Amino acid sequence: MIERGKYQSLTMINWNGFFARTFDIDNLVTTLSGGNGAGKSTTMAAFITALIPDQSLLHFRNTTEAGSSQASRDKGLYGKLQAGACYAALDVVNSRNQRLLFAVKLQQVAGRDKKVDIKPFLIQGLPSHVKPTDVLVETVSDKHARVRQINEVKDAVGQIEGAHFKSFPSIVDYHAQMFEFGVIPKKLRNSSDRSKFYRLIEASLYGGISSAITRSLRDYLLPQNGGVKKAFQDMESALRENRMTLEAIKTTQADRDLFKHLITESTNYVAADYMRHANDRRNKVGQTLVLRGELFSSRETLIEQNSLLNRVHEELELLVEQESALEQDYQGASDHLQLVQNALRQQEKIERYQEDLEELNFRLEEQMMVVEEANERVMQAEERAIISEEEVDSLKSQLADYQQALDVQQTRALQYQQAVQALDKARRLLDKSELTAESAQALATQLKAEQETRTSELLALKHKLDMSSAAAQQFNHAFELVKRVLGEVARSEAAKQAQQVIRQAREAQNVVQNEAQWQAQQRDLERQLEQQRSVRELATQYHKQHRVVLDDAATVELERERHSALLEELETEQENCREQRGQLRHQEQELQTQIARFESIAPAWIKANDALETLREQSGAELADSQSVMAHMQQVLELEKAQSMAKDKLAERRTKLDSEIERLASPGGSNDPRLKGLADTLGGVLLSEIYDDITIDDAPYFSAMYGPARHAIVVSDLSGIKEKLVELDDCPEDLYLIEGDVDAFDDSSFNAEELEGAVCVQLNQRQMRYSRFPAIPLFGRAAREQRLELLREERDDVVEQHAKASFDSQKLQRLYASFNQFVAMHLQVAFDADPEQALATARDKRNQLLRSISEFEAQEQQLRSQLQASKQALAALDKLAPQMGLLDEETLEARYHELEEKLQQLSEAKAFIAAHGRTISELEKVAAVLDADPEQFDALEQQYQQADQALQQLKAQIFALSDLLERRHHFAYSDSVDLLNQSSELSEQLKAKLVQAESERTRSREELKQAQAQLSQYNQLLASLKSSHQAKLETVQEFKQELQEFGVHADEGAIERAQRRRDELQERLHTSRSRKSEYERTITSTELEMKALVKRMKKVEKDYQDLRTFVVNAKAGWCSVLRLARQNDVERRLHKRELAYLSADELRSMSDKSLGALRLAVANNEDLRDALRQSEDNSRPERKVLFYIAVYQHLRERIRQDIIRTDDPVEAIEEMEVELARLTEELTQREQRLAISSDSVASIIRKTIQREQNRIRMLNQGLSNISFGQVNGVRLNVKVRESHEILLAGLSEQQAQHKDLFESARYTFSEAMAKLFQRVNPHIDMGQRSPQVLGEELLDYRNYLELSVEVNRGSDGWLQAESGALSTGEAIGTGQSILLMVVQSWEEESRRLRSKDIVPCRLLFLDEAARLDAKSIATLFELCERLDMQLLIAAPENISPEKGTTYKLVRKVFKDHEHVHVVGLRGFAQTEKPKTAEQKFAEELAGELTE
């Protein structure tokens, strides 16, 4: 027997009062005894926390919170912990004898919410000698220990061999591990299950009858029949999916036309544009090649004609060049003549102005002398005026101040003495004693005149001396100039060499003046030589081309006649070529007509041929002619009929299998569904239901033993059955009834003997039945399920075969329809000759004709070239004829060389002038000094010294006279000497002098004014003369500058030469223009012939360049289009050969029509609408392909893969026709097969209710002997709700009345159930629940039952268990009994979910057990012992149970630290466990050995 798992211990680490405490959990009852605050509730809280570590559920209330719904903020856990890491660990040994330590790490989280961080973990495989505290607490010293953190715990466990540490990220995983190892009785999948488990623990902890549990006993006691509900949900889901698929098929059938329309129009739209671009590209490439050939031939012809024309133009260009030079020379000569004439007129102006300038110069010199004399007179007048002013002022000051007057008179006396001394000095120097102050002025004037004369003489000598000195310098300068030109020259030869150099320079100037004339003559000779060379080249070229030497005019005339005759002959041959080419053109037009006819019939033939190839692929036949097509069409029709018959047979077999499967799947597997109803009517059970759990091996035996009675009804009593049978309306032909206990039925009533493969049953003394074991037994659920599996496999095979047959039938129908369509549309042309092959032959012939035409055109071109050559020869002869005289002209070269020598001399002369021109110009100015004698310079210098000495002596005399003249007015102060002695008369004399001085002052002022006025007039006249002289001088200089800018030497000979030169050039220009007109008339005919060819070639070249650019630019786009089409596998859809024969306008019209249809078709699809709008850009053809790909992708996405399994929309459209009908039929049948009857639903629900009633009856048996106080028994009462019983009756007995609900496609089965419930219970308000929700509730059997708890209390009998009707102890005991029932129910419910070798732990809690008396506690102990349950209770100190383990808890405080002192006691009334038979045998054996 498998032992139940047990809790071994509870370990608390770092809780309030418990630093590291382990409580051993007794196998029966563990009691925590102590006073208030001792720590009993804390210990239970640690146990519950380790069991359910969900802080959202944990809530440890105390008695002060009895009426509170929220309690304290920390929910009783935060305050029970110490700071730091805390642990609560449960040590468990399960049924497999595995030691498990389920623990949680708790830690307070700082904050006002007082939350606790909980982390669950598991330690598995700890050795038995290792305590939980050894892992969770680290011993630091003998008296100190430290709580380990969870990582340290993990490391410590890792060091223990065989131990494993596992943490859990969620509580669900933690509880799943607990369930697997048998620690908790129920699998807690979610928070709802955890809440139920916690409510159960909480109800156990606080005792009494929990209203939370009694109100929802169905959820706690009745297991959820998930399989039934899931079956219903799966059935509804399958029906819903089936109906959705049917709707999808209808939608797909509607989409089929859209598919066809969209794919047809998009194919037409894109393929037409695709083929239009392909045709256009092919045509453009062909046109490009044709134009390139024509361009190359035209270029060759043009090159030939151009070479001919170039030779003609060379002569014209030469003549034009000569004419241009002549025009330039003529224009230059005219300009030179005009320039010479202008220079002569300018020279005349200069001479006239120079005469005026000389006259002005003479008048200017005279006026300057007059102004000089007037200036001297003004200065003398100013001096006299100043002296008179000073005299007046002096006399006035003397009169004003007598002392001053005396001083003045003394000064004047001194001045008078100095004047007398000056007079004596002048007499001595002049050696004239008679000299007086009055006669000094005349003598001074005389001496001044003499001074001027001597000064002039001295200046003349000075000038001669300077000239002599300058002559010596100029001689040296001129001699240096001669040496600069000629190099080292003797001094005596300097004058001669200078004259020679000047002469050479003049000759060079004369040579340079002939420069223009010689250059013009050179150009004339060059042109004549060039003409001679051109004529000789023409003659040489003509000799090379025609092998004829042109040496005279007669030969030229003969050649002209020969070429004229050749021209006539070539023109005749050219006409013949044109006629033959016209005939070939006619034949080419006939072939073009045939090609057009073939092109017109080719599209229809291509469509017919494609349809024929499709038929051949579909049918796999040759189909060589129309007769074979008709014959094969008949064969397809016969095959289709045969396939339809095979399909019908398979459908019939499938129906039989479905009915048999449905019969075997029904309860009991009865052949007759009425038996179940009869069993309910008679109050019995089908025999097959009783034996429903037998094994497959036993099924043949029991099936043979019961024989025909295997579908009998077992009733508890046969009395009164006959009356009920008589009242039956509908009953099978044979109905077997067997009397027996339904709950404990056996086969003892049958006398059966098993034989070899059979059973022999002795019915009575005279009857015996022999039944062989059936080959396929159907008795028992296992046998039926085995048979069902085989039948379902067979049915799947039949369904697959039927689907294949349906597909083949549809395929044959489609093939027959394709034959019909082919016969109607394409049979007439499908077997005609291939027009494309005939078209290729015709095109080859046409190409041959075109090549022949090209050969004739080439021949004609050759004739034209010969004609052109002859014409060019005639033109060359015409050009040579007038210039034949130049061929033998030999003097041109000699004249040209002579002129080149003159030009060489000219270059040398220009180089000489450029090198020495300036030097020679300077030399020419000073050449005369070379003849002068520089040795006379010394005598002249001595004469100059003597004259200078005499002049200096004269200047000393003049100075003495000047000093005398300056002091002559001082002689008037002779009286001052006397006045110094006669001071009394001084004043009167001063006054007289003042009057005399004032009159003198007035007279001198008038003289000064007259002199100044006269000087002003003279100055004005001088300024006017100077301005006139300056203007004339500037004008002359400007005229000279202009004359110099003319750059010509103006003389009478120059103008005569210029006129003669101009007249000569004018005559030559007239002659050249006449010859140019002749040349232009000669080449006009050649230009006209080339003009047409050039025009044609330019047009062809432009067309070729445009076409080639178009082809090259389109190539990249076309390559991208092809790449897109091939990568997306749409090229075969777009490249339609029949469209290649349509014109571009027809294809464009086709594309535009489809575009209009597509705009309507994609109006509601944004992606396709945008793609279509972008594809309308004709410059981007790849966008149309992208649109086509988008349509394909869109249709692929629209293809339902559950109906059609292909990615190609075109193939999908073809498969739709085949698949839709078959799928519709199959889905309709599947819906009928999936639909469950209301009777079956009622039967399943009733059977489930009956099973649960029996299970609760078994649970009640375990609680029947429980007693708490006056309570002598506890039981659960279960009954079916009246409203739901009416619903079950309506489902099973009134099916016909409710067909509108269950056979309607508008409602699901759940909705039909809800509608039926409302129909049979109109008085019940359904609230806001939807029919679907209500229907799902009605499919759960638990909603049909009502559960209540009843107690047998004293004389009152069985009463409803309510807290108000029971004492506290009775309520606690009753509540514990109910909780035990719930735990036992959970274990039974979860048995199939856990391993068979696991029996889960059972443990309940009870706080404040003092409310129970000793008898009640003993009852609890008995209940725990009987049900193998552990109980953890808390009781005050006055409770001392006799059994189990008791812990005495006392909380002690030492200084600021408190801890709980714990003492454990074993119960004093412990009874030994009963020994097993093996133990007794072992003890007896040990005793015998001892003896």
From Swiss-Prot:
Residues 1059-1080 are annotated as: Disordered. InterPro entries: MukB, MukB/SMC, MukB_hinge, MukB_hinge_sf, MukB_N_dom, P-loop_NTPase. It is found in: Cytoplasm, Nucleoid. GO terms for cellular component: cytoplasm; nucleoid. Pfam families: MukB, MukB_hinge, SbcC_Walker_B. Keywords: ATP-binding, Cell cycle, Cell division, Chromosome partition, Coiled coil, Cytoplasm, DNA condensation, DNA-binding, Nucleotide-binding. Residues 667-784 are annotated as: Flexible hinge. ATP binds at G34, G35, N36, G37, A38, G39, K40, S41. One of its GO terms (molecular function) is DNA binding. Residues 302-450, 490-600, 781-806, 836-1109, 1210-1239 form a coiled coil. GO terms for biological process: cell division; chromosome condensation; chromosome segregation; DNA replication. Plays a central role in chromosome condensation, segregation and cell cycle progression. Functions as a homodimer, which is essential for chromosome partition. Involved in negative DNA supercoiling in vivo, and by this means organize and compact chromosomes. May achieve or facilitate chromosome segregation by condensation DNA from both sides of a centrally located replisome during cell division. Belongs to the SMC family. MukB subfamily. Homodimerization via its hinge domain. Binds to DNA via its C-terminal region. Interacts, and probably forms a ternary complex, with MukE and MukF via its C-terminal region. The complex formation is stimulated by calcium or magnesium. Interacts with tubulin-related protein FtsZ. The hinge domain, which separates the large intramolecular coiled coil regions, allows the homodimerization, forming a V-shaped homodimer. NCBIfam families: PRK04863.1 (NF003422). This is Chromosome partition protein MukB. It comes from Vibrio cholerae serotype O1 (strain ATCC 39315 / El Tor Inaba N16961). The lineage of its organism: Bacteria, Pseudomonadati, Pseudomonadota, Gammaproteobacteria, Vibrionales.
